[in-house]
């Protein structure tokens, strides 16, 4: 069962201890989950954009951002401020309503998906029992926003970019879902908290990446394609489509696409860490750590250390994958659209289906090792 802390219950009890009624405590709590999610997402984007600019500069033997803060750490904030004050332009022949709704439909599902990510053993906003199903459902909304943006712009490059984005997203959504289903089958749960808890038995050796190496690779490749990262950035290929479905956008509407892309990258990396790399789990069993400290596993000192370091472990694993994604972007060439679709439908889909069937067979044959 869930080992995460019910933040709503703890927050409500704290406010009730100050003399507030349960109803008032609940009303105060209502906006806080989204505020926490937005804060975490924005911080993740700022760090990722800074890393992207510095790593790309290192790959190309440049210095990169240097003047906006120490080592250019404030450059992402300067970029965001610039986009914020730019004029919001809607093309004359564009469909204004759809043109405005498109970026919103791209960004909102990605932000909502953060609600199901456990950042640590005692840091979980919403332990939804069907968290994985909710995430897959939300991610299926994004192609609608991309296609809507391309169509509403009344621009041939935008339309082609939107069509490419929708085709790419649909093509890679299916193998990604099949890869996740194999993990769900082993964990006997759709809850992200339960999936992490199932991997914390023997430290590093109990991580799902060892039992699902093929699923791990399929998920990571599909996640890069869903985030439209090189070598899969066909929808916005500058040499072919100017900027794809983003061509006619400026100011904050363009910034919403920018935010959605980077928030999705950080989210995908966090989900890889949760599903395959043990989430907040230590590389060593917690019992060993408690033994070295001369404490029991349930001792307050051990609980504080494991809770604090668990958050760091989750973020560290995620940003290791973010670093890999950034490095791939600046060191690999773009694939053609036919190669991209062939990879999704003719290669990854059959392998993901085979991996799911093999996992089911192994679960029946070796129930202890595969979560029977």
UniProtKB/Swiss-Prot annotation:
Pfam families in alphabetical order: NADHdh (PF00146)
InterPro entries, A to Z: NADH_UbQ_OxRdtase_su1/FPO, NADH_UbQ_OxRdtase_su1_CS
Topological type in the membrane: Multi-pass membrane protein
Subcellular location: Cellular thylakoid membrane
GO cellular component, one term: plasma membrane-derived thylakoid membrane
Enzyme Commission code: 7.1.1.-
PROSITE patterns associated with the record: COMPLEX1_ND1_1, COMPLEX1_ND1_2
Catalytically driven reaction(s): a plastoquinone + NADH + (n+1) H(+)(in) = a plastoquinol + NAD(+) + n H(+)(out); a plastoquinone + NADPH + (n+1) H(+)(in) = a plastoquinol + NADP(+) + n H(+)(out)
Keywords: Membrane, NAD, NADP, Plastoquinone, Quinone, Thylakoid, Translocase, Transmembrane, Transmembrane helix
Membrane spanning residue stretches: 27-47, 97-117, 128-148, 166-186, 204-224, 266-286, 308-328, 347-367
GO MF term list: NADH dehydrogenase activity; oxidoreductase activity, acting on NAD(P)H, quinone or similar compound as acceptor; quinone binding
GO biological process: aerobic respiration; photosynthesis, light reaction
Subunit structure: NDH-1 is composed of at least 11 different subunits.
HAMAP family, sorted: NDH1_NuoH
Family recorded in the similarity comment: Belongs to the complex I subunit 1 family.
Stated role: NDH-1 shuttles electrons from an unknown electron donor, via FMN and iron-sulfur (Fe-S) centers, to quinones in the respiratory and/or the photosynthetic chain. The immediate electron acceptor for the enzyme in this species is believed to be plastoquinone. Couples the redox reaction to proton translocation, and thus conserves the redox energy in a proton gradient.
Protein name: NAD(P)H-quinone oxidoreductase subunit 1
Gene that encodes it: ndhA
